[in-house]
Design a protein with these regions (language model features):
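Short alpha-helical patches at coil-to-helix transitions and adjacent helical residues
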Residues: 3-4, 20, 38, 47
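C-terminal nucleotide
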Residues: 13-17, 25-36, 43-176
Length: 177
């Protein structure tokens, strides 16, 4: 997201008139050149406002379609106090995590590919649930996202995180790091 901010500033300063899609594309190229291993989700998600579903087609040319969602389940007075952002202070390097996930995909590991397909469908389910402003189902789906992330990357849930989530598990519909 920092790279997108810098490229946006360069565009403004130099009068290049790049739109958000172009800034996202250039950010993706920059991150690949820097070997950070980033994908398009963070770049395009960070430079397009609001709650949304981003989708792309297969292939190298990534031009995400943005489908905005209502923010009711986050801003409605009945639901707003139910959301908490908690900083654990635990840091991880995305580069090595992503490299391992991509390696397993290129090796055609069946479980990995099945999980990625399941996560894609899960994203559509979440989109539909937020469209309906179904807070209870959204919480259940967030919990499912957490389980999927742990299957995708075993390091998602270190002991320090497990200790925290054990304290709140009975009080939450879902949570995610």
């Amino acid at each position: 997201i920092l790279a997108a901010t810098v490229l946006g500033a360069v565009s403004d300063f130099c009068g290049l008139r790049w739109d958000k899609l172009e800034i996202g594309r250039r950010t993706l190229v920059l991150e690949q050149l820097l070997t950070t291993g980033g994908g398009w989700q963070d770049q395009f998600g960070g430079i397009t406002a609001g709650v949304k579903l981003l989708q792309t087609a297969k292939g190298f040319g990534q031009s995400p379609e943005v489908r905005w969602l209502p923010d009711t389940v986050f801003t409605d007075p009945a639901y707003k106090p139910c959301h908490l952002l908690y900083y654990t202070g635990i840091t991880r390097t995305a580069k090595s995590i992503l490299a391992e996930i991509v390696r397993r995909m290129f090796l055609n590991e069946h479980d990995e590919l099945a999980l990625v397909r399941e996560m894609k469908e899960h994203g559509i389910q979440m989109y539909d649930t937020i469209q309906r402003a179904d807070f209870q189902e959204m919480g259940r789906l967030v919990r499912q996202t957490w389980r999927q992330n742990q299957l995708l990357d075993a390091g998602t849930n270190p002991e320090a995180v497990r200790q925290l989530t054990t304290l709140i598990d009975d009080h939450c519909l879902g949570y995610k790091l």
